[in-house]
Amino acid sequence: MPNFEQNQVIAVGLSGGVDSSVAALVLKEKGYEVIGLFMQNWETDSKDPFCTAEQDLSDAKAIADHIGIPLYVVNFSKAYWNHVFQHCLDEFAQGRTPNPDVWCNREIKFKSLLDHAKKLGATHLATGHYACIQNENNEYRLLKSNDSHKDQSYFLHLLNQYQLANSVFPIGGYQKSEVRAIAKKRGFINHAKKDSTGICFIGERKFKDFLNEFLLAQPGNIETPEGKIIGKHDGIMFYTVGQRKGLHIGGRPDAGEAPWYVVDKDVKRNVLIVVQGYEHPLLYSQELTCTNLHWIRDTEPSFPLTCKAKTRCRQADQTCVVTRLDNDHCHVQFEHPQRAITRGQSVVFYLGNECLGGGIIN
């Protein structure tokens, strides 16, 4: 984390979780004037048993009081609906699998929230992300966290130079275990609070039940690649490539005992295509194309580019060659076949520890 002048005001996005809480503590103990910001991105019934917003706000208030910083509650639900949620609905309707966290970081946390922090007099916005920022001759680089298991650079790959220049990741150099230990030592009520998982606006409720509230499901056939109908699906928007659960086609007398997996979606015919066996060759691909390209540095890399890539956040880095097709499309050729490459997800590129940027898988 860079050293700033001691009289600078830094706003911290306090989510009620342990990571942002320790991030605020680190800044406070370094002598900065710290203010907390709690985002409300989703309008929900206070009686909704699946929404943790009320508890999260309560935790954020308790932590702010504990550290001794003010906390402001800001509502970005309209911006979130317009710039994140509606985009996700459009993607689901087209049979793709979007990543809302990526869009939320670019459009809400490091845009709407950053702008609000500036209006309050803050010079920078800090969050509890596990990533690092390096200033190299006034060009900002996004680097992986020291904790490889918790690294979140994948979700931050759409950030631009302005956003990085005005952001701070105080715990990017910490291990998760260190963060929890600090929180416990300081008596934070959330030191053992579990990490949030799943899609943020769905919470712990069933994905299918939630989507049904916003999109009209169209049941259809489940077929093998050869066109044999072996079942019915509830709507292809509920499934993603590589998925095993929820197909309800096990125990067929004309097939072996190996489980079935989604391998593709035929949106035009409203057909879900499945194959049998985890290692089925159709689940693997050695190449992809991507669009909506974004490069973090002002100057994009030279092509063809030999680098590493991830097609999902927890995946190990995979060697590949990236070739520019046109202004907004790249071809990615992997050294080894990749399992369950999914349209709508992000492919993110790395050189060593640096996140270069990425695109959306076609």
UniProtKB/Swiss-Prot annotation:
Tell me where in or outside the cell this protein is found. Answer: Cytoplasm
Gene Ontology biological process terms from the UniProt entry: tRNA wobble position uridine thiolation
User: Binding residues for ATP, per the UniProt record?
Assistant: G13, L14, S15, G16, G17, V18, D19, S20, M39, G128
Active site: which residues?
Answer: C104, C200
Q: Extract the ranges annotated as region (Interaction with target base in tRNA).
A: 99-101
Recorded coiled-coil stretches: none
Example of a GO MF term: tRNA-uridine 2-sulfurtransferase activity
Q: Which GO terms describe its cellular component?
A: cytoplasm
* The reaction(s) this protein catalyses: S-sulfanyl-L-cysteinyl-[protein] + uridine(34) in tRNA + AH2 + ATP = 2-thiouridine(34) in tRNA + L-cysteinyl-[protein] + A + AMP + diphosphate + H(+)
Q: What does this protein do?
A: Catalyzes the 2-thiolation of uridine at the wobble position (U34) of tRNA, leading to the formation of s(2)U34.
Name the record gives this protein: tRNA-specific 2-thiouridylase MnmA
Q: Which gene encodes it?
A: mnmA
